[in-house]
Regions:
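Extended catalytic cores of very large enzyme megasubunits
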Residues: 1-957, 964
Length: 964
C-alpha cells in the first residue's frame, strides 16, 4: 500500500479508514487544479447534416489545449446543452463533506429569473470536468474507496487535472450522462433501467434516468432462438439495444442460437432464417442516434462458422452494397432515358402526331433504347402518358453512394460491424485441406440433450468458406474475424460460461449480458521530448487512478436489463486503454514496422495492464474481490501468470493452457526502464491477486478512441500508426492551419540532425511558404511580368491560408484592377474561380507543379535533402504521403503491432489493418492467417477503396468521355 503523502512532501490530514491512499503527482493540496491552465474563449456552432444551424454556444471557456478541433468536438458532443439550473443549492447528506455534496435546482431563487433564463447549458470546461470528477469522487467516498477525506480530495483534484490536461479521457457515455444528477439535480423519466444497490446487493429499478447514470460504452447481449416473450428473445434484444443507443452506448451479440433457414418450428412450418431477423435489428439501429442526437448507433453482429446460414451471412453486406450500386446506376439511367424520351417528344417539328412512334422516329428510337437498357415498359408508357397530359419534363431522385444518402438508407446490413467466429478446429481443417461441417441449431440442441455427436446438415471444403470470407472482406471490408479458441484460452471466468461475442469494435470480449466502461490514456503526454524519456511513474499513477474511476463507475451505473445489471455487478469488467502509440514511436525516432516498436508497445501495454490488475488486487484487499472471483480463482490466476510470462518473454512450454505462444517483450529491443517496469507490474499484480483476489475480472482493452481521441488532441488512435506527415488544424476563430506533424522535428532531433538540417527537411515536406527561390515564381521574375511589391506582398500573405500555389495567384488575392490592367484578364476571367492565372502568364503545367512543390512542399519526406536512407522508415505512415510519396507501412506490421500488445490486454484490440487498393484477396487471407498464428484475438481489414461510399478516382469524367 502507498503512504499517504501530498505533492511537495506534505502529509495528508483526516481520519484513517479502510480505503485507498491517493498520491498527488499533478496537483497541490489547497490549490485549484484548474489554476494550472491558460483558459481561452471560443464560440461554437453546431450544425445539422444539411448545414443549417442547430445550436450555438457562445463564450465557451476551455483550457488552451482545447483550441481548434478538440474544443469544437468537446463543446458539440459533451457540453450539456440544456436543463442546467441557473441557480443551485447543495443537498446535505450525513457523512458527505460540504465540497462533495450533490446539487439540485434552487426553485425558490429560480423564480426570480425570467423563465427563459432559469435553465441553461454548460459553457465552461470547469463545469464539465467537475461534473465528472465530482460524481466519481462522491460515489467513491460514500462506498469506502478512500482512506480519508484528504485522499478523496486528492483523487478529485488529480482526476480534474487528468481530463483538463488531455492526458486521458473516459468513454463518451460518461461525458453524456455522468454527473447530471450529482452536479445539477437533473433526473429525467425512468426508462426501465436496473441496477444493483452496492450497499445491499439487491436488484433495484431506477426511479429516474440520471441518478444512476449509464457510463458504459460497451455491451455484449445474449439472444435466444425465441421470437418474443423472454428477456433474451429476438424482439426483446431490439428493445434493449434501443435503450443502449439512446444513451450513447454500443452493443454486440452472437446470433448463432437462432435457427437457420428451413429448420422446423415447434408450431409447424420452417424458419425464415437468420438474415430475416437481422434485417429487423439493422433497421431499428439505423433509426436511432446514440446519445439522442450525438452519433449513429454502434452495433456488432457475430456468427459462428458452423451456422447453416453462414454463407448468406458472409455475403449479406456485400449483396446489399451491390443493390446500392444498382440503385445508383438505375436512378441515373432512368432519368437519362426519361429526358431523352421527353426531348424526342417536345423537339418534334415534323408532320403527324409527336406521340405516335410511326410519325416520330426519334421517339421510337428513344423508347426502344430505354427498353433495351431495361427501363420497364410501364415506365416508358408513363412517360408517354405524362407527355400527353402536357408534361415537358420528369424528375427522378438520383441515388448516390453517400453512406448517409437514400441509396444506403434503402438497403439493410449497413448499421453493424459483422464478424465471424473462427475456432482452431476450422484453422486446422483449413491447413489440412479438410471439410467443414454446418449444423442446424435444433440438431445441436438435440445432440447435446441426448449425449451424442450432432449430425451436420451440410459439409463443405474449409478453403471454400475461407475464400468467401476473404473475398467479401476484400470487396466491402466485412466480415472481420474473431478467433474463438484464443479468446477463450485467455478467459478469466470460464465457470460463468464461454465468451461468444464482443462489443461493436471488438475490444471488449467477455460473457454475454455484461458491460464495460472505457477510458484511454494519451501516451504522448507522458513522453518528455527534450529528455527523450517516458515518465513511467506518472503513467503508473494515471493507470491506478483510472482503474479506480472505472471501478467506481461500475458501482454507480444502471443497466438496460436485470441480467446485465447483475452480471456486471458480479464480474465488474473494466476497459482501460491508451492512444497515440504511433505518434509516440515517431517522437522516439523508432519506425512503426520495427522490432523496437513492438517491444515498446508490449512494455507499455504490460505496464498498463499489470498496474491495473495490481490496483484491482489492492481494491480487493480493501473492498473484497468481485463476487464471482472465488469460483474462477484458479482460472484467473492462470491467466495472470500467462500475462506475467509474456512480460518475461518465457518459452512456449512454460505457458499454461495455450495453443499459440504469445509474442513476449524482446528484452534486447526494449528500453531497460520500460522492461523493468513491465516485469515489476506483473510481479505485483500476480502477488496481489494471490493474496487478495481481484476486484475486476478484466481491466484493459485497446479501444478505437475516435471522439475522445479528438478531444485529447491525439495524433493517432489506439495502436494505429501516423496517417500523414502534414496535418490540418482547425482554428478557434475559423479557418484551417496547415502544420507539420509534430513527431517529425522531434524524431529528427532524436536521430541527431542539426537544427539547420531539420529546417531543410521540414521545408521539403511543408514547403518554404515564400516565392523567393521558387522556380519560375521568384519575385525578380514576376516583377518582369508587371507584379508590384504590393501584389507580391498580398500573394505571400495569403499562403498560410491556401494549400496550392494557384490559389495564391487567384484574382481575389491579386485584385481585379491588377488582373485586368496588368495581366489583361477579362471580367469573366476574374469571376471564374477556376481560372488559372499562372497558365495565363505563361507558366507550363510542369513549371507550376515544380513551384508548388517548393512553396507548398512535397507532403512526403522522401527525397528530402540530407535525410539518411536508414531513417526513412521512421517517417512511414499508414498510407503514402503527398502526391509523390511511395512508401507506407506494410500490413504485416499492423498485425505484428497488435500481436505485441495482445498478451498484455485483458480483452482485445480494436484496430483496422489498412491495405492499399492494390491489395489482393490473397493478402486479405494472409492477414487473417497471420493474425491467428500470432495469437491476436480478432482482425478487421480495410482495403482502400473497398467501400462503395468511399470516393475512388479511376479516371475523370472528361477522360471517360474521351474514351467513349
Amino acid at each position: 500500500m502507498q503512504t499517504r503523502t501530498e505533492k511537495g512532501g506534505k502529509n495528508s490530514e483526516g481520519p484513517i479508514g479502510t480505503g485507498l491512499v491517493i498520491e498527488r503527482r499533478f496537483t497541490t493540496i489547497g490549490e485549484d487544479p484548474f489554476d494550472q491552465f491558460d483558459w481561452i474563449e471560443m464560440d461554437v456552432e453546431i450544425r445539422n447534416a444539411d448545414g443549417s444551424l442547430a445550436h450555438r454556444i457562445d463564450d465557451v471557456r476551455l483550457p488552451s489545449g482545447f483550441s481548434g478541433v478538440a474544443g469544437k468536438v468537446l463543446a458539440q458532443k459533451y457540453l450539456r446543452k440544456a436543463g442546467v439550473p441557473a441557480i443551485l443549492r447543495k443537498v446535505k447528506e450525513k457523512g458527505v463533506p460540504t465540497w462533495l455534496q450533490r446539487s439540485e435546482p434552487d426553485h425558490e431563487k429560480l423564480q426570480s429569473l425570467d423563465p427563459e433564463k432559469r435553465f441553461i447549458g454548460e459553457s465552461h470546461g470547469r463545469e464539465l470536468f467537475r461534473r465528472l470528477a465530482g460524481t466519481w469522487t462522491y460515489w467513491g467516498w460514500k462506498h469506502g474507496y478512500f482512506e480519508a477525506e484528504a485522499d478523496a480530495r486528492a483523487y478529485f483534484d488529480e482526476m480534474c487535472y487528468l481530463i483538463a490536461s488531455q492526458r486521458s479521457a473516459p468513454n463518451s457515455p460518461q461525458w453524456f450522462n455522468t454527473g447530471l444528477h450529482w452536479a445539477y439535480g437533473i433526473e429525467g423519466p425512468a426508462q426501465g433501467h436496473r441496477y444493483i444497490d452496492p450497499s445491499t446487493g439487491e436488484l433495484m429499478t431506477s426511479t429516474n434516468a440520471y441518478e444512476h447514470p449509464q457510463p458504459h460504452a460497451c455491451f455484449i447481449q445474449s439472444v435466444s432462438d425465441s421470437l418474443v416473450g423472454g428477456t433474451d428473445s429476438i424482439m426483446g434484444l431490439w428493445n434493449r439495444e434501443a435503450l443502449l443507443f439512446k444513451y450513447g452506448s454500443g452493443t454486440g451479440s452472437n446470433f448463432s442460437n437462432i435457427r437457420g433457414s428451413g429448420e422446423p418450428l415447434s408450431g409447424g412450418g420452417t424458419s425464415s432464417g437468420l438474415i430475416s431477423f437481422l434485417k429487423i435489428g439493422d433497421r431499428a439501429a439505423g433509426a436511432i442516434k446514440s446519445g439522442g442526437t450525438t452519433r449513429r448507433a454502434a452495433k456488432m453482429v457475430t456468427l459462428d462458422l458452423d451456422h447453416p446460414d453462414i454463407e448468406e451471412y458472409i455475403d449479406w453486406k456485400l449483396s446489399e452494397e451491390e443493390k446500392v450500386s444498382a440503385l445508383v446506376i438505375g436512378s441515373n439511367l432512368l432519368q437519362s432515358h426519361a429526358d431523352a424520351i421527353m426531348d424526342a417528344i417536345w423537339s418534334f417539328d415534323g408532320e403527324g402526331d409527336r406521340l405516335d412512334m410511326n410519325d416520330n422516329r426519334e421517339l421510337k428510337k428513344a423508347a426502344a433504347k430505354a427498353i433495351k437498357n431495361h427501363v420497364p415498359n410501364s415506365h416508358v408508357k408513363r412517360f408517354l402518358d405524362l407527355a400527353e397530359q402536357g408534361w415537358k419534363s420528369i424528375h427522378f431522385d438520383k441515388m448516390d453512394t453517400d453512406w448517409q444518402g437514400e441509396g444506403y438508407g434503402t438497403v439493410s446490413g449497413q448499421n453493424s460491424n459483422n464478424s465471424v467466429r473462427v475456432p482452431n478446429s476450422f484453422m486446422d481443417a483449413l491447413e489440412n485441406n479438410g471439410t467443414w461441417n454446418l449444423y442446424h441449431r435444433t440438431e445441436l440442441k438435440n445432440a447435446s440433450e441426448n449425449g451424442r455427436e450432432p449430425e451436420p446438415c451440410r459439409s463443405m471444403p474449409a478453403k471454400e468458406l475461407w475464400d468467401k470470407v476473404a473475398y467479401t472482406a476484400w470487396a466491402c471490408a466485412d466480415p472481420g474475424v474473431q478467433f474463438d479458441t484464443t479468446i477463450n484460452e485467455w478467459h478469466t471466468c470460464p465457470e460463468g460460461g464461454r465468451i461468444n461475442g464482443s462489443n461493436p469494435c471488438s475490444e471488449y470480449m467477455f460473457l454475454d449480458d455484461t458491460a464495460c466502461n472505457l477510458a484511454s490514456i494519451n501516451l504522448l503526454h507522458y513522453f518528455d521530448t527534450d529528455a527523450q524519456k517516458f515518465d513511467i511513474p506518472s503513467f503508473q499513477h494515471s493507470v491506478r487512478l483510472w482503474t479506480m474511476t472505472l471501478e467506481i463507475s461500475v458501482l454507480m451505473a444502471q443497466f438496460p436489463s436485470e441480467e446485465i445489471a447483475r452480471k456486471s455487478y458480479e464480474y465488474r469488467t473494466l476497459g482501460l486503454g491508451y492512444c497515440n502509440l504511433g505518434s509516440l514511436l515517431m517522437h522516439m525516432g523508432i519506425p512503426y514496422a520495427d522490432d523496437r516498436a513492438y517491444a515498446v508497445c508490449g512494455a507499455l501495454s504490460s505496464i498498463m495492464c499489470g498496474e491495473s490488475y495490481a490496483t484491482s488486487a489492492e481494491l480487493a484487499g480493501s473492498l473484497g474481490p468481485f463476487p464471482k472471483y472465488h469460483e474462477n480463482a484458479d482460472h484467473m490466476l492462470k491467466v495472470m501468470r500467462n500475462h506475467k510470462r509474456a512480460a518475461y518473454d518465457a518459452k512456449g512450454s512454460e505457458y499454461e493452457g495455450l495453443t499459440i505462444t504469445p509474442m513476449g517483450i524482446d528484452a534486447k529491443r526494449c528500453p531497460s526502464d520500460l522492461l523493468d517496469a513491465a516485469k515489476s507490474a506483473w510481479d505485483r499484480a500476480v502477488h496481489g491477486g494471490e493474496e487478495y483476489g481481484y476486484r475486476n475480472a478484466q481491466t484493459t482493452v485497446i479501444a478505437p478512441t475516435g471522439t475522445i481521441g479528438l478531444v485529447m488532441a491525439a495524433d493517432t488512435t489506439g495502436v494505429e500508426p501516423q496517417f500523414s506527415l502534414v496535418q490540418y488544424k482547425q482554428l478557434a476563430g475559423g479557418g484551417t492551419l496547415r502544420i507539420i506533424n509534430r513527431g517529425v522535428p522531434s524524431a529528427l532531433k532524436r536521430l541527431g540532425y542539426k537544427d539547420s538540417e531539420v529546417t531543410a527537411i521540414v521545408d521539403h515536406i511543408m514547403g518554404t511558404g515564400r516565392l523567393s527561390g521558387s522556380p519560375g515564381l521568384d519575385p525578380s521574375v514576376l516583377k518582369e511580368k508587371g507584379f508590384t511589391d504590393e501584389v507580391l506582398s498580398n500573394i505571400e500573405s495569403s499562403m498560410p491560408d491556401v494549400f496550392d500555389i494557384r490559389s495564391a495567384f487567384s484574382p481575389s488575392v491579386l485584385g481585379d484592377d491588377f488582373c485586368k490592367s496588368v495581366l489583361a484578364m477579362t471580367d469573366e476571367d476574374c469571376q471564374n474561380v477556376f481560372f488559372d492565372t499562372l497558365a495565363h502568364i505563361g507558366l507550363s503545367a510542369e513549371d507550376i507543379e515544380r513551384a508548388n512543390d517548393v512553396i507548398f512542399g512535397y507532403g512526403s519526406i522522401e527525397g528530402a535533402p540530407g535525410l539518411k536512407e536508414e531513417h526513412l522508415a521512421v517517417f512511414d505512415c499508414a498510407t503514402p504521403c503527398g502526391k509523390h510519396g511511395t512508401r507506407s507501412i506494410d500490413w504485416q506490421a499492423h498485425v505484428l503491432m497488435m500481436a505485441a500488445a495482445q498478451p498484455f490486454i485483458s480483452g482485445a484490440i480494436s484496430k483496422t489493418i489498412n491495405m492499399p487498393a492494390s491489395a489482393s484477396i490473397d493478402d486479405i487471407r494472409e492477414a487473417y492467417e497471420l493474425s491467428h498464428s500470432t495469437m491476436n484475438k480478432a482482425c478487421a481489414v480495410y482495403r482502400d477503396g473497398s467501400k462503395l461510399s468511399q470516393p475512388c478516382l479511376l479516371y475523370t469524367s472528361d477522360a471517360a468521355d474521351d474514351q467513349a
